[in-house]
């Protein structure tokens, strides 16, 4: 088993991040502004994760100044999340931070090692299962077929109403994605039900991820 990684967590309801994507953030809460600055300084990864439930709700009817100077809702994070390193794009005059997280890998929480002012967890990488070598060629073929089916389905469902999306899917960069890359990077362009995306994130094979996507599109 690989060495545990210490990662700072940024729980965001309904946001599921996938490896190979970039997550833009507009950060205004004091604790998370501190987290961004600390992690950039210390070269610590930040995990962006969907949430299970609200632990403490935010105060209602806050002014912008109140929101900027007090912590908001606190959430219980999902156990599986994705993480990467942060780039600060801009810090505004009032202290807000525009940042991007370059998502690199999936992780599973082992234990919490800090809760205040922001959560830091010890985590283990979540890897795909290793297929039987004798089945590898047939699995890869099925995955390519599923990728083609999903692309065709998306063109029928969305393409006619969204020429920009149609051009993206038909473009050389999109067409060059292998099934594994496709099973993640699809969600840099499209957002589905967050719990479904969480199930895809937790799936431990490309085929399992593609099957969930295909079944969802065929409902």
Language-model segments: what does each one mean?
Residues 1-219:
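N-terminal low-complexity, acidic/polar interaction/targeting segments
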């Amino acid at each position: 088993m690989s060495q545990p990684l210490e990662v700072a967590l940024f729980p965001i309801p309904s946001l599921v991040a996938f490896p190979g994507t970039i997550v833009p953030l507009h950060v205004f809460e004091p604790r998370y502004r501190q987290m961004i600055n600390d992690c950039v300084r210390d070269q610590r990864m930040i995990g962006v994760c969907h949430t299970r439930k609200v632990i403490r709700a935010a105060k209602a009817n806050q002014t912008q100044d109140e929101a900027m100077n007090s912590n908001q809702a606190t959430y219980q994070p999902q156990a599986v999340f994705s993480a990467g390193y942060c780039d600060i794009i801009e810090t505004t005059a009032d202290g807000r931070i525009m940042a991007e997280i370059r998502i690199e890998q999936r992780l599973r929480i082992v234990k919490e090692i800090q809760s205040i002012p922001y959560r830091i967890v010890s985590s283990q990488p979540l890897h795909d299962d290793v297929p039987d070598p004798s089945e590898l060629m047939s699995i890869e073929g099925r995955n390519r077929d599923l990728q083609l089916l999903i692309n065709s389905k998306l063109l029928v469902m969305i393409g006619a109403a969204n020429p920009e999306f149609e051009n993206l899917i038909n473009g050389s960069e999109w067409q060059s994605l292998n099934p594994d890359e496709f099973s993640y990077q699809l969600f840099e362009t499209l957002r589905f039900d967050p719990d479904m995306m969480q199930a895809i994130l937790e799936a431990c094979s490309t085929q399992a991820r593609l099957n969930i996507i295909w079944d969802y599109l065929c409902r």
